[in-house]
Amino acid sequence: MCTGGDSNFQTLAYSRHSVRDFSDKPLSVEQVKKAVKLAQTAPSACNRQSSRIIHVTDREKCEKILNIQGGAKGHSITELLLLVSDLSLYRFLSEMDTPYLDSGIFLMNLLYSCTYYGIDTCPLIWDDYGEKGTELRRILPIGKNMHVIAVIQIGERRENSVHAISHRRPFEDVFVEI
């Protein structure tokens, strides 16, 4: 068990950055599977485990998906992970936000798991409503009960590439004690 004095998680968390410049080297499928398996340790409401991962390695399909997504301009095309949530596991109106909460927790765990296994990532926002969802389903066999939450570019960063330094809000702006 990790304890407060164990800096391994702290080192991992501070070392994770979004990467946008990937090498052409394909990842090992086993490496990706290990990261997803570790991400499955994420908690979920009532242990529903609604998150699913679709690993897309076909470069042509990746390019089409990123064109639909629209925000990955200037990124090198790599492999993608699509995080989807099985909406059939949620039956009540009061649970309508739960797939996003569960998937958000899973996504963060996935990003850390990828970092742990040496896979660089760049999470991208996805709007699964309207035309984008329809276009995506023409490319990939995604069931109607599956809601796309995020697209994650994965790969190995290009040698000598740099990543943006994203400054964090001051701690005092984030933490309130009452």
Label for each model-derived stretch:
Residues 1-178:
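Acidic, surface-exposed loops and disordered segments
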